Amino acid sequence: MPDSDNESGGPSNAGEYASAREQDRFLPIANVSRIMKRALPANAKISKDAKETVQECVSEFISFITGEASDKCQREKRKTINGDDLLWAMTTLGFEDYIDPLKLYLHKFRELEGEKAIGAAGSGGGGAASSGGSGSGSGSHHHQDASRNNGGYGMYGGGGGMIMMMGQPMYGSPPASSAGYAQPPPPHHHHHQMVMGGKGAYGHGGGGGGGPSPSSGYGRQDRL
């Protein structure tokens, strides 16, 4: 007796696979449902077919707008689609009523991204400042020892806010001092310490705004 479709993995499994591939084109339905519920009273319900309808419409809208923006980038020999390209595409396709609020949103989004980047850079500089401050007390003693011995040298300040205290191990007889004073014999072991701090170590803030990272390419889907 021939196997059924379910047993042989025939049309039934193929249909399920095709349905899964079709769902890959859409936004996750849980996200769509969550957005829809924000516009409804707390006790409102949304049917499954309503969620699926909005899911398909939103996904097609995204493909429609992105495809138009992609054409613009190709004409201008660019590989990265940015927010301004999408706003241009919406205006071209007749969605100009949505442009003003979206421009405000895009401007605010870029401001927040810039503030996040500055805050991250500031927190990193503050950590370097605290570590530099804790090491400066003990480091000053090491620097004094290094200054009294040949081969040791110290650096303070500098444009990048670097504090360096370094001594080199001594081998053989020490060279004569430039001042002509007798030098003590070199120790067998010499301290070697570096304290690195960014500009934040001296109270200077640093940071930079970051724009959206460019994607390596873009795809174009068929539009309705």
Swiss-Prot record:
In the record, biological process GO terms are: regulation of transcription by RNA polymerase II
Which stretches of sequence are listed as region Subunit association domain (SAD)? Answer: 54-65
Query: Which CDD domains did the record assign?
Result: HFD_NFYB
Give an example GO cellular component term for this record: CCAAT-binding factor complex
Q: Does the keyword Plastid apply?
A: no
Q: Which pairs of Cys residues are joined through disulfide bonds in the record? A: none
- Regions of biased composition (Gly residues) lie at 121-138, 197-212
**Low complexity compositional bias, start-end:** 213-224
Asked if the Swiss-Prot or TrEMBL record annotates the protein with the keyword Cell inner membrane, the reply is no
Principal place of residence = nucleus
GO MF terms on file? DNA-binding transcription activator activity, RNA polymerase II-specific; DNA-binding transcription factor activity, RNA polymerase II-specific; protein heterodimerization activity; sequence-specific DNA binding
Q: What does this protein do?
A: Component of the NF-Y/HAP transcription factor complex.
Q: Which family is this sequence assigned to?
A: Belongs to the NFYB/HAP3 subunit family.
Quaternary structure, from the entry = Heterotrimeric transcription factor composed of three components, NF-YA, NF-YB and NF-YC. NF-YB and NF-YC must interact and dimerize for NF-YA association and DNA binding. Interacts with NFYC2, NFYC4 and NFYC6.
Q: What is this protein called?
A: Nuclear transcription factor Y subunit B-10
- Taxonomic path: Eukaryota, Viridiplantae, Streptophyta, Embryophyta, Tracheophyta
